[in-house]
C-alpha cells in the first residue's frame, strides 16, 4: 500500500510539473527598432542594424525578459562578408546553454537552440561581423520561439529518477530480491561499475571537451535525427547537414548504434547530452562485454576483472574517446573482446573427446563481427586480417569438421544480418559514387608510424594531433599502448620461462603465446620498424600498398594490439595464480597501478587543458570541415573542397527556362517550369547527386546529374511540374527484408534450441 501511494504521489508531482513546464509564452519578435548599434561604425534604420568594413561586435538587442525553458532562436540577416556570429548574453547569472551560431554569407537565416535553466530579465543577443572592404552585414530581425523540449526532458529525467528511487526502496524493504544473490557477485558488480564510472569522469563536466572528430560525429547524430523525422528507416541519406543537400553518412558509415542518441535528440535532449549518454553507454558495453568474454575464456572472475580494467582504461581506448573523439573506433573496440572469445570458442571444440560439436559456438563470433561492421569498417578490416592469419596458422584445425562449419556459419550469419547495410555500401563503392580520397597508400602508413620508444610510454598529453614521424613527437597526441601492456607481456614471458608455472594451465599458456605473438605483430605494424615505405616502392605490390593504405594511419594497429596484449596479461596472472598466488596478486596490483594512474592523469589533463565546447544543436557545427571532415562521401563529380560546396541553395536554370514554382522539404523537391527554347535545357537542383533519387514520370523531363548535382533536363517546349525525392533502390529494401528475416530466424532457432536443451 505504501509503495502504491508513493508511486501515486510521484505521478502527481511529475504530472503537475510537466503541465507547468509545458506552458510556454508567445513568440518574442525582435524587430529592427529593438536592435541597437554597439560599435560606432554600425548604423540602424527600419531595415535593421548595418555595418560595413568592420570586424568585431557591432550590434546587440535591447534587454529581453526570458522565463526558464527551451527556445529556438531564429536570426534573419544579409551578409556578403566572412562568416558573422551570434551569441547570447545572460547578464546576471550566466547559466544559459546555447550554440555560438555562425552567420554564413550564403544564407539569410540561422537557427540555434537556447536552454534557460533559470529565467532572466536582462538577456540579449550579440552580433559579431567579419567584413572587409565593400562588404556589409545586415541584421534584419530575430524571433525567439519557445519549445516544449524543456518539458519533455524534465519529465523523462524525472521518470528515470523515480524509477531508480522506487527500485532502491523495494530492495531496502525486501519486496524484491537483489538480482545478484552472492556477496562475491555484488563485489564484482561494484568493481565493474567503478571501472565504468572512472572511465567516464570527463563526462561529468557541464560541457564537452574538444575532440578531433567530435563535430563530425555530432553531425552524424543530427543527420540521423533529421532522417528519422523525415520518415526514413533505416536512414541512409542525411537530410540536415551541408545545407540540406543530402549526404550519405548513414549509408557509407553505419550508425545503427547512434540511433538511441538520435531518439534522445528527437525527445528534446541537447546534442551534447545525447552524446554523453552514448559515450557512457558504449563504455558500459565495453565493460560488460570484456568481462563476459574473459570470464568465459579463463573461468576466473579475478582475471576477467583485471582484463576489463586494463582494456577499458587502456591508453589507446581513452585517447580514442576523449582526445580523438573517434566514435567509430572506440565503439568497435567494445566488440573486439567478443571476436576474440568467439574465435577461441570455435577452436576450443574438442571432437577427439567424442563430444558433439557445439551447435551455437559460432554465435559470439558472428555477433562480434556484426558489432565491428556496424561500428567501424577499418577496424573490421583489421579484425579480418588477424583472423585470417590465425586461421592460416592453425590450418590443420581450421579445415576439420567442427571448426570449418562453425566458421562458415558465423560468416554466413554475419553477412545475412548485415546485408541491409552492405548492399547499398557495395553499390556506391563499386560504382565509385563517392569521392573517398585515394591519397592514402603504404607510404602514408610509414609517415604515420610510431617510434618504438614512444609506443610504451607511461604518460601522454591530451592535446595535439598525430604528426608526421619526421616531425618528432613533441606536442603530439598520445600514441602509446601504455606501460601496463608492456609489463603484462613481460610477466607472461616470465611465466612461460618457469616450467612449473607454464604447466599449471596449458590453455592459458597457449592463449597467451598466441595473443602475445599477434599482439607484437600488430605493434610492429604500427611502428617505424615495419617496412611500409619499401612496400610503397615495390611496383608489383602497388595494389596491396593501396589496399593497406586505406587504413590511413599505421597507429590504427593499436586497436588489435591493445586487445591482444590485454588477454596476454590476463594469461600471465592466470598462470601464476594457480601455482604462485602471491606473485599473481603482486602482478595484478602492478598492472592496475600502471593502468589507473596514467588513465587518471590523461583524463585530468583533458579536463583542465582542453577547450570547453557547447553543442546544443547542429547550429554549433556550422562549417564544412566541422560537419563532414574531408568530405570523403561527397559526389565524385564534385571536385570542390572549399566553401563553394555550401552555396547553390536555390535551383539554377539554363537560359530559356522559366521556373514558376519551387518548394524544397528536406530531400523532396516540387517544381514547375517551362522550357521556352528550342533546345534541351536543364535546372540544377540544390541536391547532391547520389543513386536513390527518383522523379515522378513526366514525358519530356528526365532526372540527370552534372558536376555532382541533380539536374532536371527538359525537352524543347516542355511545360509542367515534377517531384524529385529520395526513395532509395528497390533492391535495398529486398536486402532489408532478408536481414530482418535472418535475424528473426536466428532468434527463433536459438530460443528453440535453448528450450530443447533445458528439457534434456
Give each language-model segment a name:
Residues 337-361:
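Membrane-interface transmembrane helices that cradle and orient dolichyl/undecaprenyl
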Residues 196-335, 342, 371, 377-378:
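Active-site lumenal/periplasmic loops and adjacent helix-entry segments of GT-C-fold
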Residues 24-30, 406, 411-499, 620-643, ...:
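Periplasmic/ER-lumenal interhelical loops and adjacent helix-loop junctions
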Residues 382-415, 491-505:
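Perimembrane helix-loop-helix junctions
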Residues 149-151, 178-180, 643-760:
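Active-site-proximal, structured, solvent-exposed surfaces of multi-pass membrane proteins
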Residues 1-18, 150-202, 509-510, 590, ...:
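Start-transfer (signal-anchor) and selected internal transmembrane alpha helices
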Residues 342, 361-376, 410-416:
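Membrane-interface alpha helices of multi-pass inner-membrane proteins
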Residues 11-19, 195-207, 226-233, 269, ...:
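Membrane-interface helix-loop junctions at the exits of transmembrane helices
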